[in-house]
């Protein structure tokens, strides 16, 4: 990848560059519109239905289905859909304003993202890890000193999700209007279709003023931060209810916090990924991070609050270690990809520069041999048993 230009050079290039081309669709118009309209209409009620199932139906899909069948889909959803309350709005705006203030005020190193399609170089302030630490310390301190009880968040969770569903939809309308009337850079443009523009977004790097990056706020400081805060909330709520926290909840919370910590440790790397450098700020990214992440990603803990599972020390430790290993693999894959880009491919593999493939010939040969042997075995069985082999394959699709 080309070395990023300076911000001044990028600004000059952006002034001359035409507006970025709108995002292209890879499917037919029918599939594109059907999929977008389906997600726009089905995701909001699914969030509420998931909350109801986890909290009020003991996680039973059958009970949730019976409720909808008894009352009808629309009336059933209307009956379980909580109305946003003032408490819910206060929690959302309090959290959002706190995170926005941290994003703007905390110190951080200057980070330049990859060159955009229009030649712009987005500039960020890398203070995510500091904001994450301040958020958790503040949240736990408010609980510890009796200033705010996080259990209130769980008690009003349905109302919070309902407010987020509607509020985030309005926010996406704001982004659509802003993209038309006041884009932040030349990396913006319209496809000419309202549905596509609203769903995918108008701007790649929308900002309020010069320094407040909207996608960093929605994706990182609200979405990912709320994941960690809600994980802690569920833990505290279970402790308040039972006087103890089940080992299953401890493992769940620990793994979520480790993952989110990894995310903020690596936040500047995330700014080089598809979510930030390719996907525009629309319903898909912004509504997803504002609503989908805090509701769907935290749902295991949401269920465990009222349904503690006692794993036992050995199983709990095994799950914890396996989870940590998976998180490390995920992190190292991202790290290697970023390192490869940073060095323009001139990086080491297992401490050495990649040079020769012949020492790996045995692995390559054995892979080809095993695939060939599996195919020949399959052909022989098909020839020998005819239609009965096909019946067997249909019943046992995964065979050794």
Which residue ranges define each predicted feature?
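Membrane-anchoring alpha-helices and their flanking helix-loop junctions
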Residues: 2-400
